[in-house]
């Protein structure tokens, strides 16, 4: 029997593990052979859960952030973390790493990038940085304090994580255009939250971008994810109460 992941195999800011139980309930409300389109694929967790719960469905995962590349490099990431763990032996757990040990760790990461051409900096960040900090390069990491938070166990290879799922990599508006006329299509809408951290997303988000997303919802079935830290629902409520207010600028 296929394993269903309750959280993404690799770290990702904004993955929907806390919503999984409620999301599973919602999936049962749609008819057989429904087409689900995950417009903001992120870690792919929503697409994965959808395909596991609804194997009859067509599931489209928009992997705009190229999470697949991170998954494909899990074996190399595990080796790198194992080497970093060895370098940090004797360093107190969760304490700051400085001096020669810090330099050796950066040298090992640099060698990985030179020899293999790729380092999963988001996953490495989860083992070396605190407070949900993530970097995208060694240059950025060298500016940060690093800590001995290195994961003790290897990451699962997750080879079946995206099994049976159609994968695309486009701007969400292009994906929407491709599927908007499919009968009964359901859009899974999980944009980076307004007023929250969007650092691991490749696109830059402005207020206008969030409002553009709302045009996708009109006239279609959708599951929309938000947060009590986001202001988007408050904004929509204000717009509903003030429909005739034009721009004062």
Task: Put a short name on every predicted segment.
Residues 58-60, 185-187, 219-226:
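Hydrophobic beta-strand segments of well-ordered beta-sheets in folded domains
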Residues 52-58:
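Conserved S-adenosyl-L-methionine
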């Amino acid at each position: 029997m296929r394993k269903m992941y309750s959280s993404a195999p690799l770290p990702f800011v904004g993955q929907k593990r806390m919503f999984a139980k409620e999301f599973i309930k919602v999936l049962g409300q749609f008819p057989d052979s429904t087409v689900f389109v995950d417009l903001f694929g992120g870690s792919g967790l929503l697409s994965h859960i959808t395909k596991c719960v609804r194997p009859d469905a067509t599931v489209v995962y928009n992997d705009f952030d190229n999470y697949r590349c991170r998954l494909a490099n899990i074996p190399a990431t595990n080796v790198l973390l194992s080497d970093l763990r060895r370098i940090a032996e004797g360093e107190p757990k969760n304490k700051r790493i400085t001096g020669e040990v810090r330099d050796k760790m950066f040298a090992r990461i640099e060698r990985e990038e030179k020899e293999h051409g790729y380092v999963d900096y988001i996953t490495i960040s989860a083992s070396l940085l605190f407070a949900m900090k993530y970097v995208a390069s060694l240059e950025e990491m060298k500016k940060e304090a690093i800590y001995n938070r290195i994961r003790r166990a290897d990451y699962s290879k997750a080879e079946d994580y995206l099994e049976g799922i159609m994968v695309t990599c486009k701007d969400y508006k292009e994906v929407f255009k491709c599927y908007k006329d499919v009968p009964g299509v359901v859009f899974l809408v999980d944009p980076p939250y307004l007023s929250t951290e969007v650092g691991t997303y490749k696109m830059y988000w402005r207020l206008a971008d969030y409002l553009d997303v709302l045009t996708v919802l009109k006239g279609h079935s959708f599951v929309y994810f938000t947060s009590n830290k986001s202001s988007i629902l408050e904004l929509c409520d204000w717009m509903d109460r003030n429909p005739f207010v034009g721009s004062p600028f």
